[in-house]
Amino acid sequence: MGRIITLLIVFLASIASKSLANTPNQDTDVKGKVVNQDNQPVASASVYLMSASANVLIKSAVTDDQGNYVIIKAPKGSYYIEVTSVGYSQGKSAVFELGDNTYQVEDIKLTSSSQAIEAVTVQGQLPLVQNVNGKLVLNVENSAVAAGNNALEVIKRAPGVSVDKDDNLQLMGQQGVNVTIDGRQTFMTGDQLANFLKSTDGSQIKSVEVSTTRTAKDDAEGAVGTINIVLKKNRTEGFNGTFVASAAHGKYPRGNTSLNLNYKKNNTTLFGSYGYTNEKQLNELDLDREIENAGVTKYFSQKADMLEKSQNHNYRVGIEQKTSEMNTMLFQVSGNNYMEDSENSSVTNIGFTPTSVDTILRSPTTADMGLKRMSLNFNNEYKIDTLGAKLTLDLDWSMFKNRSNMDYRYRTENPSGNLFYPEELERSNMPTDIDIYVGKLDYVKPFKKGTLEAGLKYSNVKSDNNMLFEKMEDDVWENVLTRSNHFVYTEQISAGYLDYSKAFGKWNAKVGVRAEYTISDGHSITADTKVKRDYLDFFPSVNIGYNMNENHVLSLSYAKKVSRPNYRFLNPFRYYIDKLTYQLGNPYVNPQYTHGFTLNYTLKQMFNFTLGTDITNDAMVESMGQDAETNTTWVTRENLGKSLTSYLNMNIPLRVGNVWSMNNNITGIYMHFKGPIAGYEIDQGSFFVQANSMHTFKFSPQWSAEAAINGNTPFVYNLFKIHARIGVDVGATYNFKDQKSSLKLAVTDAFRSNRNNLSTDFHEFQSKIRQYHDNQTVRLTYTYKFGNLKQQIRKKDSNNEEKDRAAN
């Protein structure tokens, strides 16, 4: 692996040494002016650079007080300019060819509209999926299918993203995804992350960015890549807001509502939002198991219906202050309060043949859970000069308080309903407190022939989990010491990075290294044991790009990444899922390190193809075990063997006529694992396909419709065979003529086919799992915009146009 890294760096250096200092850059600027019919400048008009061949939006800008605009660093090609402004009809330039020199567009004259409206419909709106700076971006702001859903449901629709039976996010078929919000790390994985995303209002999301590569500036966490959730931001002058109300019905009714407010005057912007969700849903689980003991096989057939009722309040409030022409400050507070009550009616039939029943285990469980989250963020961006040098400071504090109380009742009966043993009563109380402190400083310095980026970051995480488990003995609750546990985990990461990028002719390159020093301490207070670690890691990254012309762009990248275990996986404790199944913590499980290689090809600025390979040694995998004496099954995490995953992701947008546009994302994945699992050596590979096809039909300015189809073919993942899955979502949108309100109707999982079915057939491990979340719903969402709805005025960093376009 070190040899490959060395070859990449040598290749980069050889290219740089052969480059001529005076080689012209491929990217050039487009300038122009927008005037009205009296030749007076039109300020704050939105200007769009459109590809003439593909008719898609490439870049954007806003005119200044004199009506002038500059679109910087546009690649060579054929384009035209499209202009919109409040009170004017749409303007358009002639098609022009952009070469090596700055192009001056003839003045575009706008005529007053006889039916001036307060908002303008932009014909060059962002496509549903686009490739921005090597990231696949899902734009969901106006999606009927995504409207009214939570963040987890929105993310599931992003290219290359899937969710397993436990709601763990996967990217290109792999776990180990780093989820960020507006570029800030959440520091959560597993069920903590899933519950957090379920409690996050999807109507606050503008887009979802998916990336399988990283630079030295990015956190090394996330072995397979990063999913960044970009929240909506509105910086329109004056007062404005948006009200959203959504009602849905699955097995039971559910609904949510939200209010977003924004006020901007001169250099001060105040913003805030509040959302409320009330849901009731039924999740179904069927589990069949076989356990052999002394040549005798027992069959267990479990059916569980889990009724969940939840409420969630989420909020965000903040202020952005431009203190000078060179400095901007931002302070915001966000959080949510999530409450859930659940009832699990589980029945397990036990017999010595698959059809006979000798024993029935009834284990109804009730639970109430609460999750409180609060985050404070301070950001200060100082522009050192007008050439792009800047210094950015980020300070974050986040607090999570998770409360979970469960009551268990076990009845072991014969088929006639008579008890074999006295009824058992148990209960648990599991509070978890997490505090996260993060400080980050980033510096950017452009030079004549390149750009230097450097930064420092410090994070401190403390997780305190105090599990109390009790059992009723002689009408008195007694503490079960073997199942109670107090575990405190602290982790400090100090990081620094250097990145240098350079463009020479048709070539560009970025090389960097990130260092992370980690100190961790896992302390089981109950067992009086500690596992301390401290280690220094270096994470190199290299990216080499070649812009052949506007139709052909290639890039090759390498990065070393890491996935750290969930805090709960490190807790040396048995976490019981039911009486016969538990998760076993492993305090000695180590982070896994992944070497990722990607080759990316973009055709005609539309079609994107990514070929990638991830190699992981000492892979952190899920292992299983069984106790034939007690009929229990346990699951744990261990560092076992080596995994290799190769994938080809193809993102293909197409347009059929003027009405129908689609985006097809197809990923072919090969996963191979070699190593011991559950006491047996495995050396196996599996190929499968994930696909997501989204279709938009624009019938008129008022009417549009959507359809989304997603699924995967069968594949093998460690001990599990994952069965094929398919889901179909449809929706329609009606925009009222006042341009302020809209109505969206959506049907999710229209054919009730989006199921999680899997099985194991591995030596003594024989099981079948059939799982269905309450996915099939009909949802109606109403949106109303009020206040000043004029075009948003945005002053953008001249070196980051496309990123701003995707993130604002």
Model-predicted segments: where are they?
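Outer membrane beta-barrel strand-and-loop segments of large Gram-negative receptors
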Residues: 303, 436-440, 480-485, 596, ...
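Face-selective signature of the C-terminal outer-membrane beta-barrel domain
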Residues: 3, 314-338, 365-523, 547, ...
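Outer-membrane beta-barrel signature, preferentially recognizing the C-terminal barrel domain
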Residues: 485-491, 562-610, 615, 635-646, ...
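Surface-exposed extracellular loop regions of Gram-negative outer-membrane beta-barrel proteins
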Residues: 519-521, 550-596, 611-630, 750-763
